[in-house]
UniProtKB/Swiss-Prot annotation:
Organism lineage string: Eukaryota, Glaucocystophyceae, Cyanophoraceae, Cyanophora
Record family assignment: Belongs to the TRAFAC class translation factor GTPase superfamily. Classic translation factor GTPase family. EF-Tu/EF-1A subfamily.
Positions that bind GTP: 19-26, 81-85, 136-139
InterPro entries from the UniProt entry: EF-Tu_GTP-bd (IPR041709), EF-Tu_GTPase (IPR050055), EFTu-like_2 (IPR004161), EFTU_2 (IPR033720), G_TR_CS (IPR031157), P-loop_NTPase (IPR027417), Small_GTP-bd (IPR005225), T_Tr_GTP-bd_dom (IPR000795)
UniProt region (G1), positions on chain: 19-26
Protein name: Elongation factor Tu, cyanelle
tr-type G domain location: 10-214
Gene that produces this protein: tufA
Stretches the record annotates as G5: 174-176
Gene Ontology cellular-component terms listed: cyanelle; cytosol
Length: 409
């Protein structure tokens, strides 16, 4: 079967379903793909196909994630859905499946539950910027006031975690009834079935409310340095993969991290032994730098657009600690623990100053399998920004994954 071609001119957005177990995330994912397929926008995916999510590895952690894609009139979407709660936690913290926005699924029959709260908190901490809410299982509610009550509760919860609770669009419906309508008539068009229309209304809200993200190429230039060598008569070359932005010969860049920030000019760019005028996000490239000695550069520094990123040593982070079965520690650890923090291309030693539970109370120790907020101090300053991912390692093996939620100094 030929792969379906998507329109490359439409803007692309990464999205995901989040929410409490059994509130209908996977059923909704199936309903969205099926409803849009009936409009000729993508391939319908069954619940079982999505639920049997393949395992993948991100930063040494195994995560089960299902990826589906579909399009609306306006945009092309890559959509991620996870079978288990632990998979969501791992996914959001490692950034394995980056989300530009989320659909929060809440069962109208049950209202917000513990994982609803936890996913909203996580979305805030890891920098999922926007979400739209789908109140599912509307058919199980006889009283319109009850639906309104659930909506108010969810809006309050969103506001509590600093999302604009009063502005976020809410759509109610039944993913299951929409799927049933579509399975008996796969060619249903807009306006022909109440439940299918509600799924399409949800996607209209996603189209309207979740902004198209800035493309990596349009962001300010950053490249983590992987290696450095000197070429006799030409100077020093730093190699790595451009994380974002673009760079041209003649532009000024800054070397940031581990030592004092230093400004230098790009005198040449090379890729696969060929010289280039410009390098872009995603390129593996060698950058020739003016007036810099090989000894000035170390793996773990970054080259960046001047003023766009600064070195820091202390930050707050949201961390998932691996279980023994995942190859993590067998025993708990306490504050004062000094592992290595693997950031971009290098390990930096740091100490964990404090642990904080979701309710803001201090935690004494952390067990394998926990998710916790921790304050970290590094022994060397490195280029850090909010939303940056890192791994925690001990003796070369990964024991945790984290994301920077706030820079302290």
């Amino acid at each position: 079967m030929a792969r379906q071609k998507f329109d490359g001119n439409k803007p692309h957005v990464n999205i995901g379903t989040i929410g409490h177990v059994d509130h209908g995330k996977t059923t909704l994912t199936a309903a969205i793909t099926t409803a849009l397929a009936s409009q000729g926008k993508g391939k319908a995916r069954k619940y079982d196909e999505i639920d049997a999510a393949p395992e993948e590895k991100a930063r040494g952690i195994t995560i089960n994630t299902a990826h589906v894609e579909y399009e609306t009139e306006k945009r092309h979407y890559a959509h991620v859905d996870c079978p288990g709660h632990a998979d969501y936690v791992k996914n959001m913290i490692t950034g394995a499946a980056q989300m530009d926005g989320a659909i929060l699924v809440v069962s109208a029959a049950d209202g917000p539950m513990p994982q609803t709260r936890e996913h909203i908190l996580l979305a805030k901490q890891v920098g999922v910027p926007n979400m739209v809410v789908f109140l599912n299982k509307e058919d199980q509610i006889d009283d319109a006031d009850l639906l309104e009550l659930v909506e108010l509760e969810v809006r309050e919860l969103l506001s509590k975690y600093d999302f604009p609770g009063d502005q976020i669009p809410f759509v109610s419906g039944s993913a299951l009834l929409a799927l049933e309508s579509l399975s008996s008539n796969p060619k249903l068009m807009r306006g022909e079935d109440k439940w299918v229309d509600k799924i399409l209304a949800l996607m209209d809200a996603v189209d309207e409310y979740i902004p198209t993200p800035e493309r990596p190429i349009d962001k300010s230039f950053l490249m983590a340095i992987e290696d450095v060598f000197s070429i006799t008569g030409r100077g020093t070359v730093a190699t790595g993969r451009i994380e974002r932005g673009a760079i041209k010969v003649g532009e000024t860049v800054e070397l940031v991290g581990l030592k004092d920030t230093k400004s230098t000019t790009v005198t040449g760019l090379e890729m696969f032994q060929k010289t280039l005028e410009e390098g872009m996000a995603g390129d593996n490239i060698g950058i020739l730098l003016r007036g810099v000695q090989k000894t000035d550069i170390e793996r773990g520094m970054v080259l960046a657009k001047p003023g766009s990123i600064t070195p820091h040593t202390q930050f707050e982070s949201e961390v998932y600690v691996l279980t023994k079965d995942e190859g993590g520690r067998h025993t708990p650890f306490f504050s004062g623990y000094r592992p290595q923090f693997y950031v971009r291309t290098t390990d930096v030693t740091g100490s964990i100053d404090a642990f904080t539970a979701d309710d803001g109370s201090n935690a004494e120790m952390v067990m394998p399998g926990d998710r916790i907020k921790m304050t970290v101090s590094l022994v060397h300053p490195i280029a850090i920004e909010q939303g940056m991912r890192f791994a925690i390692r001990e003796g070369g093996r990964t024991i945790g994954a984290g994301v920077v939620s706030k820079i302290l100094k």
